[in-house]
């Protein structure tokens, strides 16, 4: 008996829910069609009253759904879902009513949509509703399947229950398949890859499946989505996604790149060690041969013309050897080669400080004694290789020094004398003016030039310490540059005087205000007054704080009788803060007397106050006035 009473109570509640939803829909339609603000507020109150009744019924339904006395809870869940849907609609109405009609957001909402865009949005909306309905049905079927599984007994199989369970599972899979298709249609609609008309053509078939798929005599259309070619779209989407994943898999990993970089570093280090060892061996050989060349300097007094011709022939051979060996030496480290050649030339300068540089290096290029004819090719070969290494490094570092090497010419007997100390001092001056990397290159250039040029040394008894050598053009240029730099340093300005002059010049640096011309006050109606009266207006009249303290009549006076001044600008800004708006057609300030009766995208109409500045200088009221937004002075300020 109690179960029957409970069932009657549930049916009464369902009837109340149906009636309440019908009343809610009726009030909602009236609210959507209304244009009056006051009427909308009244209808919103009616909606709120009705939704509260539905919420109480929803709480009762939730209580019954949670109890175990009722076996079939499908109707309870359905009515609860309907009430919750109406609650969501009421929330949307509340958000819309909170937006003011004359605000920016309100005007943007009221903007008209394109008909095609509106049709697309409507199509997306009903597809979304269909997906939600299928999701709800799938949840109910899953709940039924779970309850059916709970009735199975251990060790016993009921074939009828099993067949019913398999039927439920197939229906769930079919629902999910349709959900995927509908979601794909929505995605293609949003991307404008399919027209809304093509989707609306199959709307009836889709809604037939959504509403009648649970009936016994339902016949499903297997070719429902064939007209939309969704299989090709899904295949292209899957191919694009797989392409992105494959491209990401082909990218090298950080660990692989780091391992390859470490292997490259180890390989470079090994090559550098091999180059250093090779350069060291070349350096040792060059030092030994330079000592042998110094010992043979004593035999240079017995030279004749025949030996000079022989020296020319050997010089040509040394140059050819230099060219042949240059390709092999170029692979060595330039820095190591520089140090090696520097070490070759320095012992000669130290052992014989009074001997010219050309004397110490002449035998390197052309030994002239008959006893040294067998060892000369070896000496020239080794010195040529060292000189080629220096030339390769020098050509990489500085083209100017390569040009200096080419400027060296054979000396003549009538050339002026230049001892080694003078040459060393000039190279030192070159080192001071050059960069640190290039400081060792001049010495290297001298050794190379001495190895590739012909030198004829004929010392006499009177020339014990100084030997005539050629003065190349590049040395003359260096001497001139050195003298010029010394003269410039002598006439340099003292740092203290320079700082003092700079500070004095900064005192008169022009300011940003110097760019604008000063605007002096010129009275409109000048009248002679005593000097103790103010000759200019107070700065207070040009401040926005003053406009906040005066009444609107004063603001109107400042606006109309101070044209083109800053006072007119601040008066207009203050009037806008007080909800006054300027009409450009009538050149009059208007203010809303009440809420407008009608608001559109182009105008609004209602009762307004305006200031009569041409007549009686008073505020007047004008009813049923249409304010066109075209003549509004500032749309942003008006909608703020």
From Swiss-Prot:
Residues 319-374, 436-458 have a biased composition (Polar residues). The modification Phosphothreonine is found at residues 369, 433. The modification Phosphoserine is found at residues 248-249, 251, 253, 366, 385, 435, 449, 471. Residues 301-310 have a biased composition (Acidic residues). The modification Phosphotyrosine is found at residue 474. One of its GO terms (biological process) is regulation of DNA-templated transcription. Residues 235-374, 432-471 are annotated as: Disordered. One of its GO terms (cellular component) is CCR4-NOT core complex. Residues 245-262 have a biased composition (Low complexity). Residues 266-277, 285-298 have a biased composition (Basic and acidic residues). Residues 37-162, 287-331 form a coiled coil. Keywords: Activator, Coiled coil, Cytoplasm, Nucleus, Phosphoprotein, Repressor, Transcription, Transcription regulation. Gene3D superfamilies: CCR4-NOT complex subunit 2/3/5, C-terminal domain. It is found in: Cytoplasm; Nucleus. Its main location: cytoplasm. Belongs to the CNOT2/3/5 family. Acts as a component of the CCR4-NOT core complex, which in the nucleus seems to be a general transcription factor, and in the cytoplasm the major mRNA deadenylase involved in mRNA turnover. The NOT protein subcomplex negatively regulates the basal and activated transcription of many genes. Preferentially affects TC-type TATA element-dependent transcription. Could directly or indirectly inhibit component(s) of the general transcription machinery. PANTHER family: CCR4 NOT-RELATED (PTHR23326). This is General negative regulator of transcription subunit 3. It comes from Schizosaccharomyces pombe (strain 972 / ATCC 24843).
């Amino acid at each position: 008996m109690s179960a029957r009473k409970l069932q009657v109570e549930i049916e009464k509640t369902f009837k109340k829910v149906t009636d309440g939803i019908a009343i809610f829909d009726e009030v909602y339609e009236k609210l959507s069609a209304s244009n009056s603000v006051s009427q909308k507020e009244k209808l919103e109150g009616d909606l709120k009253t009705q939704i509260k009744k539905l919420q109480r019924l929803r709480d009762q339904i939730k209580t019954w759904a949670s109890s175990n006395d009722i076996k079939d809870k499908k109707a309870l869940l359905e009515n609860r879902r309907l009430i919750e849907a109406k609650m969501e609609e009421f929330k949307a109405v509340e958000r819309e009513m909170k937006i003011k009609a004359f605000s920016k957001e309100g005007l943007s909402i009221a903007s008209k949509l394109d008909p095609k865009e509106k049709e697309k949005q409507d199509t997306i909306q009903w597809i979304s509703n269909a997906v939600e309905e299928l999701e709800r049905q799938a949840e109910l079927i899953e709940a039924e399947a779970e309850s059916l599984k709970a009735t199975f007994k251990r060790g016993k199989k009921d074939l009828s229950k099993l067949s019913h369970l398999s039927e439920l599972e197939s229906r769930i899979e079919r629902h999910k398949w349709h959900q995927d298709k509908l979601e794909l249609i929505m995605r293609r609609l949003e991307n404008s890859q399919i027209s809304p008309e093509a989707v609306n053509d199959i709307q009836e078939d889709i809604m037939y499946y959504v509403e009648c798929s649970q009936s016994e005599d339902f016949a499903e259309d297997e070719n429902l989505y064939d007209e939309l070619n969704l299989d090709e779209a899904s295949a292209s989407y899957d191919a694009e996604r797989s392409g992105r994943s494959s491209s990401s898999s082909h990218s090298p990993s950080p660990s692989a790149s780091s391992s390859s970089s470490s292997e490259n570093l180890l390989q470079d280090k090994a090559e550098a060690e091999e180059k250093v060892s090779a350069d060291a061996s070349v350096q040792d050989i060059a030092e030994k041969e330079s000592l042998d060349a110094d010992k043979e300097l004593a035999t240079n007094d017995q030279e004749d013309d025949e030996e000079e011709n022989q020296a020319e022939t050997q010089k040509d051979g040394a140059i050819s050897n230099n060219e042949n060996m240059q390709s092999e030496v170029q692979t060595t480290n330039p820095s190591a080669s520089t140090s090696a050649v520097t070490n070759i030339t320095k012992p000669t300068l130290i052992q014989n400080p009074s001997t010219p540089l050309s004397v110490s290096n002449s035998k390197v290029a052309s030994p002239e004694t008959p006893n040294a004819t067998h060892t000369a090719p070896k000496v020239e070969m080794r010195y040529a290789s060292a000189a080629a290494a220096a030339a390769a490094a020098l050509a990489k570092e500085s083209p100017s020094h390569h040009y200096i090497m080419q400027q060296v010419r054979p000396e003549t007997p009538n050339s002026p004398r230049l001892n080694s100390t003078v040459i060393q001092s000039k190279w030192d001056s070159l080192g001071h003016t050059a960069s640190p990397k290039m400081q060792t290159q001049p010495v290297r250039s001298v050794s190379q030039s001495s190895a590739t040029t012909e030198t004829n040394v004929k010392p006499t008894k009177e020339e014990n310490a100084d030997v005539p050598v050629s003065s190349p053009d590049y040395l003359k240029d260096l001497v001139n540059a050195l003298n010029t730099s010394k003269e410039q340093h002598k006439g340099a300005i003292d740092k203290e005087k320079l700082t003092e002059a700079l500070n004095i010049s900064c005192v008169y640096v022009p300011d940003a205000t110097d760019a604008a011309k000063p605007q002096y006050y010129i009275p409109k109606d000048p009248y002679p007054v005593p000097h103790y009266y103010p000759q200019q207006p107070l700065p207070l009249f040009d401040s926005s704080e003053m406009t906040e303290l005066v009444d609107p009549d004063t603001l109107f006076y400042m606006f109309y009788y101070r044209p083109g001044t800053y006072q007119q600008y601040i008066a207009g800004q203050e009037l806008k803060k007080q909800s006054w708006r300027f009409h450009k057609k009538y050149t009059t300030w208007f203010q809303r007397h009440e809420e407008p009766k009608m608001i559109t995208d182009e105008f609004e109409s209602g009762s307004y106050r305006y200031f009569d500045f041409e007549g009686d200088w008073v505020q007047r009221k004008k009813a049923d006035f249409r304010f066109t937004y075209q003549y509004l002075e500032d749309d942003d300020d008006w909608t703020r």
